[in-house]
């Protein structure tokens, strides 16, 4: 799920995907789901860690609103530390502004 620059509100395209996937997420039992917040390289490391956390928290709050049990969901922020795309342009940055779902 991707985010606009310097934003943590969930975009309408991401809301649509989460709404469609909510039933599958509700059925997910056993194990833990980790929502990893990520940012592009712009901004200070401290700012990006906080922004990544706000992104992960926003996704968890939206999942809760959809009726997904959040007791086994954790959030973590990696800020700019784990880019998906190593480039240094808007195309790469857009891919790096994301929340990644990881199941353990």
Outline where the language-model segments fall.
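Extracytoplasmic/secreted proteins, especially bacterial periplasmic and envelope-associated proteins
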Residues: 13-20, 46, 50, 54-58, ...
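Extracellular/periplasmic catalytic domains that process cell-envelope and extracellular macromolecules
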Residues: 26-28, 92-95
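Short beta-alpha junctions and helix-cap segments that line functional grooves
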Residues: 86-89
